[in-house]
Amino acid sequence: MSKKILFPQIKGLLHGSDYNPDQWLDRPDILEKDIELMKKAKMTSMSVGIFAWAAYEPSEGEFHMDWLKNIMDKLYENGIYTILATPSGARPAWLDEKYPECMRVNADDHRAHHGFRHNHCMSSPKFREKTGIIINKIIDTVGDHPGLVMWHISNEFGGECFCPLCKKKFQDYLADKFDHDINKLNKAWWTSFWSHTYNDFSQIEPPYANGEFSIMGLNLEWKRFTTWNTTDYMKSEIEILKRRTPNIPVTTNFMQLFPGLDYRV
């Protein structure tokens, strides 16, 4: 069986790092120096755009994409290829202000405020809609760029959301898993202990900090659901990338010894 070479245009190993030129767009002298140092270090690829959503779309529907093409052009002209990220790992403030349902609800049943990163609800249709729009804009701009060698979806997936959307999705997930038979779930989880028997899937809640967390079956299935829902979200990004740029590989980065997700899935 012949082996497929993923990056035939790159001689040797991929050698590079994360690169955030969007933070220095007002300093072309720094950007020029960056490339000089990359060449000195014999770098062959850079991961670009991981947290660049606000640079791409500073306000809703206002897109600034030229800087990305200019950066990729300069990298390519200097023999450096681009691993291009989707920017869903961190959201601009306008998105959270207008669409607060994109922000996660914590285990204490309080919605998070804007800030940090990866605190979005992966069940949110609005979040998926907005990430789809910005991903398509990126593809429109550089999807056929000769320097593009790989897609990098988001960044360091992790965390969980306890919002009403995730609660309903969790209930539907359980109903499908247990053949819509609540008695089968009760038996599997031994809910008769402490009289915690359910009559309907709609009664099941995530393991809130001030709610039901003593049923180990519930805790386990919630962890499984969180991995499943994260994977489902990842597929929504991958589908766009593979449909529009079928010859470009897609990957993401995980975190060593991270207990929040089952990476085997």
PLM regions and their residue ranges:
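Short, solvent-exposed turn/loop segments enriched in Gly/Ser/Thr/Pro and often Arg
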Residues: N20, S47-A52, A85-W94, V149-G158, ...
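Boundary/entry segment of secreted carbohydrate-active catalytic domains
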Residues: I5-R27
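Polysaccharide-binding and catalytic clefts of secreted carbohydrate-active enzymes
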Residues: A112-V265
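Short, well-ordered coil/turn segments that N-cap beta-strands
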Residues: I10-H15, K42-T44, Y76-T82, D144-V149, ...
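Aromatic-lined substrate-binding rim segments of carbohydrate-active enzymes
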Residues: L31-A112, N136-I139, S236-R244
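Alpha-helical scaffolding within the catalytic cores
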Residues: S2-K4, D29-E36, N70, I138, ...
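Acidic-and-aromatic substrate-binding clefts and catalytic sites of carbohydrate-active enzymes
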Residues: N20-I30, A54-D66, P92-A93, G159, ...
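A short alpha-helix capping/helix-coil boundary motif
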Residues: G12-H15, V48-A52, H118, I215-N219
